[in-house]
Amino acid sequence: MSLADSVLAVNNDLPIRTDSPVHSGKVRSVYWLTDADSRRLIKTKGYNVPEDTPLAIMVISDRISAFDCIFHGEGGLKGIPGKGAALNAISNHWFKLFAENGLADSHILDIPHPFVWIVQKARPIKVEAICRQYITGSMWRAYSKGERVFCGITLPEGLEKDQKLPDLLITPSTKGILTGIPGVPAQDDVNISRSDIEANYQAFGFEKLEDIDLYEKLLKDGFKVISKALADIDQVFVDTKFEFGYVTDKDGNSKLIYMDEVGTPDSSRIWDGAAYRDGKILENSKEGFRQFLLNHFPDPDVLLNKDRMPEREALARDNDLPLEAMMQVSRTYTGVAEKVTGAAIPLPANPKADIIKILREEYDLIL
């Protein structure tokens, strides 16, 4: 098997029994199970959800996206070796820690394989729940241009790039394109304020006004749990994005849960603690890959300017990135995962075959 064979790049063509179209995201694909299979698994596997809960198989890939494009490497390498397994392992670890600390549940019911989650269907909150402990990235870019109000929060004068903020800040943005909300442009990833959410809480998917307080508490509490654990291995939790949704429990009550992934190098910035104390930034997240791309291509504006999206897509499609750059990302992701979990990340030679075998033999879900 070659290195390219060990990468799961295409994850939306598995022969999983479903009666709905496969939903393909940038990194994960979701296969909604039939009602009969959902009910069977809930009963035979003992999942603690109502018997009529829709279930899905969520399969992560090793694809690498940045600036809203998928990139690939030399030698037919269509993704990052170990990336998918690393992301899932990190999220699994944090979700377990959240449960131990009495925080909310996640959408994950079962983990058949390092690349696979069995999840319950949730009603998503249409907010990218972003939490920041340091001023960097888009917040710093806005601040350096003189902006002092960010997502409705007034920032103090005199802040310097990459410094720790006086408070842990929640700076939400829209999840997807939302229409008909006063003062909120119908664009993806638009910064919004808490007052925007309060005035239109149902349009953002909140069932009750007071659930805004709950989502903020779960966001901050989750951030603090991860930040403390990362500090114990001398890593700095800089900022992150969480996602939330509602599920119905066995008693028929709605409850807010964590969704998607949490605290990963894809959804967060993580800095090396020793380097930060020396006044340097050593990225242990996808931000390092983004910086590589900005330096690698002669015209970085293509990657930053939303008006040049066709050029950006062509750039990603037509350029094989150096193998060493791809492997550096692999080392970053697997390294963080091994530090966080304390265990080596499995790198199966043929992950797709492994997934099909397990889902056939242990779950009877393969056509």
Swiss-Prot record:
GO molecular function terms listed in the Swiss-Prot or TrEMBL record: ATP binding; phosphoribosylaminoimidazolesuccinocarboxamide synthase activity
Alphabetical GO biological process terms: 'de novo' IMP biosynthetic process
Keywords assigned: ATP-binding, Ligase, Nucleotide-binding, Purine biosynthesis
Pathway(s) annotated for this protein in UniProt: Purine metabolism; IMP biosynthesis via de novo pathway; 5-amino-1-(5-phospho-D-ribosyl)imidazole-4-carboxamide from 5-amino-1-(5-phospho-D-ribosyl)imidazole-4-carboxylate: step 1/2
Entry annotated with the keyword ATP-binding: yes
GO CC annotations, alphabetized: cytoplasm
Catalytic reactions on record: 5-amino-1-(5-phospho-D-ribosyl)imidazole-4-carboxylate + L-aspartate + ATP = (2S)-2-[5-amino-1-(5-phospho-beta-D-ribosyl)imidazole-4-carboxamido]succinate + ADP + phosphate + 2 H(+)
UniProt signal peptide: none
EC number(s) on file: 6.3.2.6
PROSITE patterns: SAICAR_SYNTHETASE_1
Entries under PANTHER family matching the protein: PHOSPHORIBOSYLAMINOIMIDAZOLE-SUCCINOCARBOXAMIDE SYNTHASE
Family: Belongs to the SAICAR synthetase family.
Protein name: Phosphoribosylaminoimidazole-succinocarboxamide synthase
Organism field: Shewanella putrefaciens (strain CN-32 / ATCC BAA-453)
Organism classification: Bacteria, Pseudomonadati, Pseudomonadota, Gammaproteobacteria, Alteromonadales
Gene coding for it: purC
